[in-house]
């Protein structure tokens, strides 16, 4: 039987491909382990239908704690163990100090000029210095104590006014409270467009996270338009830019001491510094970091802490007893009242272990070719450190999936990235610079919510019926809002 034209072409193509495979030069390079891949999309099919941090963790358990993934056009190495995290984030930290370019960073973050996405170099080093010495110093974080206490008290009053025994949407209330705290820290009391600003930030966070088609096929610019991503981000950015311009224009400035400066005051004071001048867009990009990233991560952590405590009545009873014994019936909670509460600290540490704010941290990018344990890593290879997997590594953590705050008792482990089995804020040069501010915005709100109220699920549901399903975005949030019934 004669072969059809189509069959002939197919046979010829197969023969040609096999010939090319057989005759291509043999490489002596040692290749990282990886799953089987498909043409064009690489390994993306392994992650379809999963939470990215969980899907990548499952692959690592099969292919190793240092593995390769081809995500579309982007060659990526994934680190899922303390051993490899320490190797890369210490020995090779500067080699992997860059950030990969993203469409979101280009449009929303004013061409990647914020602290989070700025490429490694002199500009980033100066931004880091600005954060360390001015914006996010211990002294500056402390200066916002009174507004944290005031906004926490406002939340307590709102819950009390709603009435004992009536369900409260804690997700919405916590997000609003922390957004207000950060808004006041950034801009001062009472910006006119705060609600609109908060909604825009929420939309940005919804557009961020996961593996976006525009970022895994960066050379295919038509996909940016075909997916609608560029148009959506451009529209969001236009609204955002107008709002921040209005906020800056209406900002009264600071005529008193540095101790009363808002974050915007600090940047406007330093904007025309001879040593390190900032453009108007630089200021806006940094402000967006302070407000956007801080609101999402802190509110998510408070929500997850309460969720875990609801599911673990023993721990809930213990932390509430500690708070109520220490405060002895006081009306308002002050930060100095809770600084030495050990079990509250354990609860926060354990929450950050199980629910790190950024489970895949922020991806890095290789700045030059490097050899890792005999594996050749090419320039511009993307690095993902799966903190979610590291924090649940059964080799380092007994009953790793269980919420057990006591595991941190008498432990030297801190949240600051010195121990590589526990990296809630990352480690190395690109570690989250806002860890101190983030912790302050978790500790006091959580203490107030637990001290003033007892909580239960609505409709008589038992504690183990609480839905803990995740939703992936810029951070990992609860998929459903945390709605609980207070009593007081």
Curated annotation (Swiss-Prot):
Cofactor: heme
UniProt-annotated binding residues for heme: 432
Pathway(s) where this gene product acts: Secondary metabolite biosynthesis; terpenoid biosynthesis
Main location as per UniProt: endoplasmic reticulum
Xref: Gene3D superfamilies: Cytochrome P450
Entry-listed glycosylation sites: 255, 260, 379
Enzyme class, spelled out: oxidoreductase
PROSITE patterns the record matches: CYTOCHROME_P450 (PS00086)
Regions of this protein lying in the Cytoplasmic compartment: 1-6
Classification via InterPro entries: Cyt_P450 (IPR001128), Cyt_P450_CS (IPR017972), Cyt_P450_E_grp-I (IPR002401), Cyt_P450_sf (IPR036396)
Enzyme Commission (EC) number: 1.14.14.95
Entry protein name: Germacrene A hydroxylase
